[in-house]
């Protein structure tokens, strides 16, 4: 049963593998990245396999944790983490393991991911609508003084 109020708070090092990204290494889809050099806490997600810049830490969640949910959980807590562990504009690699993760059961993880995907879809539809209206406006303005 989906229950958003029941979760446990765990450290990243207990539920994921992490290491500074290596140049030329291909990381699997579902890898989250956290920029640790000259950063303001930028987190990204690999939706397909690819390379990760060496100023990032590549984070691969353990089996039983949805990779996109894991990324969402990281984005939720990045401000708290940065406030506590950032040293100037950098983060020490070993401190990444202390990142707090709010971990729901797998069914709830899937529900949260489905909601975020729906929101992303709706945002994309709205962006497309705005672009169509901009094109219409430009077309009308260019034809106004024919």
Language-model region placement:
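Generic structural signal for secondary-structure transition and capping sites
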Residues: 20, 78-79
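Short, surface-exposed secondary-structure edge patches
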Residues: 21-26
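Structured loop/turn residues at beta-strand edges in well-structured enzyme cores
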Residues: 5, 28, 94
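Amphipathic alpha-helical segments
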Residues: 100-142, 146
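Non-catalytic DNA-recognition/assembly elements of restriction-modification systems
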Residues: 1-20, 103-106, 130-132
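A short glycine-rich beta-alpha junction/loop motif
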Residues: 51-57, 87-107
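Short amphipathic beta-strand starts and helix->beta connectors
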Residues: 41-43, 80-86
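A short beta-sheet element
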Residues: 31-75, 92
